[in-house]
Every structure is written in C-alpha cells, then in structure tokens.
Amino acid sequence: GFMIQGGCPDGTGMGGPGYSIKGEFAQNGVKNDLVHTEGVLSMARAMHPNSGGSQFFIMHKASPHLDGSYAAFGKVTEGMDVVNKIAGVRTDYSDRPLQEQKIKSMTVDTFGVDYPEPEKC
C-alpha cells in the first residue's frame, strides 16, 4: 500500500472523536503546501471535506494524487523504518493488519510555534 492509517478510538477504522474539524487543504479553500511524500502525516476523512477527526495516515510512498485534497500536517523525522515495517505486515481482505499495530510513543515538535485548536464543524 501507499500509507498506513490509525487514530480510530474504537479500533474499527470507522470511529472518531464525536466531532469533526475543517479540512485544511486547497480544495477546501485553505492554503497547504505540504505534499504527500514518504513520511508525511495527513488527516483521514470521509467523502465530506470537513469530516476529519482523530484518524490520520502516514505516507509509505509518495502519493501526489492526494495533494490539495487531504490535509497534510506533519512529517516523520525518525522511525521511517518502523513505518515501512508496519506497511509490510500481512493484512486481511480490507487491508487491516492481521496482528494489531500500535504506536507506543510519539513526540510532536512544533519548533516553538503555538498552534490554535483546529476549527470544529
């Protein structure tokens, strides 16, 4: 596959936090120059542009067809070997890993910038 996805609070791949946030990408009227190259983090969503909540995906391979349509917001700076390992595990018919994969720890570096809460819809 081209990405790995996570962030569903109930573990089904269909759940969310009970709210959604505005999609911050060009097709939704928001300037976002971060492109979907290997290691980029982006918000997962349903068909509606403002349907993102807690689910996200990490690019395993460059996917320029997502640029402007999904809200890229970060990049893996260490641990792409882990991303690649997860991307290579055996999956079922719907691309879910046969063995559960969990992020045990993560650090977010905002480089000193304080970002506001995202706009909820």
Q: Which residues fall in each region the model found?
A:
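Cyclophilin-like peptidyl-prolyl cis-trans isomerases
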Residues: G1-C121
